[in-house]
């Protein structure tokens, strides 16, 4: 059996093993998926040891996505854009890294949420690793406008500058803004900050919404409730990040195995667990 794992610190509560085990059972792929708790300062050595023990690849979660980016021998174009890696494949001539977060987000919005991003006005809140990883796939989806807003606008500007050429090629009006001055009336609003963990209803004002806006928090379950409750109180349609989590996992599975698993049943099962908790 081929071995895969999620590498991070901590990974105790990760749902990745449950998700990938279901993907393996569904597709008939012969693999096992584990948790790899990596102590600070030991990322490369820990992953190398896992590879030496039969590992074929791993997902990478906080706080090691930048270290994975630096350690990879090759990177996919979307990983280069994100400047972060969440999926490593152990090839004979070195590690190949990908970033599946943004692709998972776009697929969740468009396929599971039923909302096409083409021609829409999109607001992305935050400029950390999660937001930066989402930027290129969001641009590729063809919105008319994409605004990245952040508490410190300089960080958002760095990501915007890195993606400026792609945005021009796709005809997307891409810009950076502060949380207090990010515009109004967006069709899709994505929260890539941890504001909900602090119990904050929203890092931006209600002017960003319009009737029927789709609002998504990258957090899922109880962690997303403050932001989503705020959105619903203003008439928006709200989604948490569970779909994104499962869709990015499916992208990683495909990157490793060349087989794309179905996500509906996995999503329904985990949603039922969350609702029952």
UniProtKB/Swiss-Prot annotation:
Catalytic activity: shikimate + NADP(+) = 3-dehydroshikimate + NADPH + H(+)
Molecular-function annotations in GO: NADP binding; shikimate 3-dehydrogenase (NADP+) activity
A GO term from the CC aspect: cytosol
Ligand binding (shikimate): 14-16, 61, 86, 101, 220
One GO process term, biological-process aspect: aromatic amino acid family biosynthetic process
Name of a matching Pfam family: Shikimate_dh_N
InterPro entries per the UniProt record, alphabetical: Aminoacid_DH-like_N_sf (IPR046346), NAD(P)-bd_dom_sf (IPR036291), SDH_C (IPR041121), Shikimate_DH (IPR011342), Shikimate_DH-bd_N (IPR013708), Shikimate_DH_fam (IPR022893), Shikm_DH/Glu-tRNA_Rdtase (IPR006151)
Protein purpose: Involved in the biosynthesis of the chorismate, which leads to the biosynthesis of aromatic amino acids. Catalyzes the reversible NADPH linked reduction of 3-dehydroshikimate (DHSA) to yield shikimate (SA).
PANTHER family recorded: BIFUNCTIONAL 3-DEHYDROQUINATE DEHYDRATASE_SHIKIMATE DEHYDROGENASE, CHLOROPLASTIC (PTHR21089:SF1), SHIKIMATE DEHYDROGENASE (PTHR21089)
Subunit record text: Homodimer.
Recorded family membership: Belongs to the shikimate dehydrogenase family.
Official protein name in the record: Shikimate dehydrogenase (NADP(+))
Organism of this sequence: Leptothrix cholodnii (strain ATCC 51168 / LMG 8142 / SP-6) (Leptothrix discophora (strain SP-6))
